[in-house]
A protein has these predicted regions:
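Acetyl-CoA-dependent GNAT
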Residues: 3-60
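Conserved active-site alpha-helix within GNAT-family acetyltransferase domains
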Residues: 105-122
Length: 151
């Protein structure tokens, strides 16, 4: 896969600053990914986000997009703003939909998914052999999806 220029991932409040790209790994079932710092206009890091390109069982449970906002910057919708920028990058990779997942008790993340236009597909129990279950003790995920075509 060819990684694209990401300098356009900016709006009036934030910019996504590319930290690294990671090639996919078929053996580990990993998809190619972009990893960003979510920064203010002066370049101060307020959180991180990533976009995984493509779809497989791992992204169904783990999502195409991940984000984390540092505690002191929460409440300003920075995750929402980052997701909207990542949608544009996903479109450039001809992705027609994206999955975002979160834990059922993560109400802030659930609101972020709803704010950006995702719909809840299901709340699912993670398979016994899923890494999030084995390594982090997580048992359930909310699976949200957004259609990118026509948006």
């Amino acid at each position: 896969m060819i990684f694209l220029d990401t300098s356009f991932l900016v709006n009036d409040e934030i910019q996504l600053c590319l930290k690294k790209t990671v090639d996919g790994n078929r053996e580990k079932n990993w998809l190619p990914a972009y990893h960003f710092a979510i920064c203010d206009k002066q370049g101060k890091e307020m959180g991180t986000c990533d976009l995984r390109i493509g779809h497989n069982l791992s992204t169904y449970y783990g999502g195409n997009i991940g984000y984390r906002i540092q505690e002191e910057y929460r409440g300003h919708h920075y995750a929402q703003k980052a997701c909207l920028l990542l949608f544009e990058l996903a479109k450039k990779h001809n992705m027609d939909h994206l999955i975002i997942t979160c834990n059922p008790d993560n109400y802030a993340s659930r609101k972020t998914c709803e704010y950006v236009g995702c719909h809840l597909v299901e709340i699912v129990e993670l398979p016994e052999d899923n890494n999030m279950r084995l390594e982090d003790g997580e048992t359930e995920k909310c699976i949200y999806q957004i259609e990118l075509r026509g948006s």
